[in-house]
Amino acid sequence: MARLVRVARSSSLFGFGNRFYSTSAEASHASSPSPFLHGGGASRVAPKDRNVQWVFLGCPGVGKGTYASRLSTLLGVPHIATGDLVREELASSGPLSQKLSEIVNQGKLVSDEIIVDLLSKRLEAGEARGESGFILDGFPRTMRQAEILGDVTDIDLVVNLKLPEEVLVDKCLGRRTCSQCGKGFNVAHINLKGENGRPGISMDPLLPPHQCMSKLVTRADDTEEVVKARLRIYNETSQPLEEYYRTKGKLMEFDLPGGIPESWPRLLEALRLDDYEEKQSVAA
């Protein structure tokens, strides 16, 4: 099986799938809180020297993939999105394809068994390519998954991205993909006014170039009914998961203040990475 490698130690994923199918997963060992969770006095570290092992949580459409992908590029670690793994399996016409299609189109969560199997295969492939560290996006989604993950490796930090539900619905309904190049875009223009002490949120659409305009397609599961069902299911399952990581001192909750131009610099600051990006830009 694949191994999740960290500096000065490694955590074997041997038996990762078998652990899941056992009646229960052993409780993971409590780890020291990530230095990124401390206040302004937190020491800055060189993330590339740490082979970071991070998890991104958040409702569907919040932008986990966008920010996890950017951090992946900045830190030089793989971004592993379980949603992408599911879509790749759907497109493969493999044995799980039809079953997954029914689950996704109904807005249901894919079972733990399937997700663990797909993730195990991805980690094995990554190890073969010499990858170390990771940023997980979309896993874990359940307490069972979190316990399994905690049993085989130490997570440094869990970033929980947040947006108001009405913004999430609009973002999901605005998602588009170019059927030719495969790039993702968003046609939603969001301008939520602030009220009751809550700041307003403005997000410009992420429009495609001219050559992609006529080739845009919508995901089958991005209908209002399905999106709201997914949000409801996520909210029901996320609270125990958030509390699990909160008690371990690993949860960082981050309210997105707007689109990428507003949110990215503030996220880097919260992660103590703002000066790191500047150094990377100078070195480039």
From Swiss-Prot:
Monomer. Keywords: ATP-binding, Chloroplast, Kinase, Nucleotide-binding, Plastid, Transferase, Transit peptide. Highly expressed in flowers and at lower levels in roots, leaves and stems. Its EC number is 2.7.4.3. Its main location: plastid. This is Adenylate kinase 1, chloroplastic. It is found in: Plastid, Chloroplast stroma. The keyword Kinase applies. It comes from Arabidopsis thaliana. PROSITE patterns: ADENYLATE_KINASE. Pfam families: ADK (PF00406). AMP binds at T82, R87, K108, L109, V110, G138, F139, P140, R141, Q145, R219, R230. It catalyses: AMP + ATP = 2 ADP. InterPro entries: Adenyl_kin_sub, Adenylat/UMP-CMP_kin, Adenylat_kinase_CS, P-loop_NTPase. Disruption phenotype: Enhanced root growth and increased amino acid biosynthetis in the light period.
